[in-house]
Amino acid sequence: MVSVNLPWELVEEILCRVPPQSLVKFRTVCKQWNSLFDDNKFVNDHFVQSQPQLIFRTESKIYSVAVNFKGPRIEVHELPLAIPGLKSEMPIRLHDYVDCDGLLFCTSYFNGVLIWNPWLRQTRFFPSIHRYPVTYDIGYDNKKQYKMLDYYKCEGDSSIKSIIYEIGLYSKKVKDLESDSTWSIFQSNSVSLNGTLYWAGVDVNNGIFIRSFSFSTEKPRTFCSLPFMYDDDNVLALAVFRKDRLSLLNLCNKTSEIKIWLTKNNINDREVGLEEDVVWINLMTVLIPNFPKFSFYWYNRPDLTYFLDNDDAKRLVICCYDETDQAYIYIVKGDMFKKIKIDQYEVLSDYSRPHFHTYIPSLVRPSRVKEDNKN
């Protein structure tokens, strides 16, 4: 058989679509292939092509769950817990991790943040946290300085306190977030898009707003409103689509009707997003038979996470628990519906249910996070 040398541009295009768990095995093929892992353009292009996955932990293991739409079926991978650079006496809190641009940020029982790429098996640890947070999110400013926002509601009033940690700079700021009594930040999970945080809030008239927090200005603001009203029985979940748009799931607990909303245009500029500039479209409305009911409180994240297929926005993946506390994945497109049990799931020793998080696998190295040795 005669070998054919493909144009290098075509090779890059093909490799951009290979999942990272497979791609890392190809590093030894040749020096040119290995060099792609240091090519920022290739890493970013690969990240845009990557399909979202789910990540969760049991009592002793941590798993990723990929959806193969041929079938469809799920593929569960156990991630190594022997994390390089992590001392055995310093266990990370595997239920406390957030995704930001393909990196997992994990808080720990010891004072610090572990930055982890499970597919590259690379970590970086920053001992910059002076108390461990209750609720936190990760983003970065216009200089690509990663920061952590630890926020909590104050008892007795509507104010929201926050601590902003500059990861790697060994500094923190304690400040009051600008807020009022007309909205709540805890009506959905938060997501990070281009370094800025977004979440859904509800005003006293049950109008739904998307709030944002810029790590450049260190101020929250109303990003836009949504074209429907909120109901106390509904569950909201926010997600990032194709790294440049926001989507919102609105589940009616009474009818099990699910509506998916999507921003019509890309959100490219992190400082621009006036209410009149953001247009939402109702992407789909689905009704899943025997879909479980949910409870949601301000101090808890929704017991539901979801994402849209990068290659087909009309294909929806939802992960949640049923009434027996068993975890399932629901795959929906039009009239097609499939429910798949996650066999590896188990209730934790404290009888709590582990949270499922959406995670986009990447080739991003933890070393991209800047560090300043000034104390």
Curated annotation (Swiss-Prot):
SMART domains on file: FBOX (SM00256)
Alphabetical list of InterPro entries matching this protein: A_thaliana_F-box (IPR050233), F-box-assoc_dom_typ1 (IPR006527), F-box-assoc_interact_dom (IPR017451), F-box-like_dom_sf (IPR036047), F-box_dom (IPR001810)
Disulfide bond annotation, renumbered to this chain: none
CDD domains attached to this UniProt entry: F-box_AtFBW1-like
Pfam family, one: F-box
GO cellular component, one term: chloroplast
Domain F-box: 1-46
Transmembrane segments: none
Signal peptide per UniProt: none
Name of the protein this chain belongs to: Putative F-box only protein 11
Protein species of origin: Arabidopsis thaliana
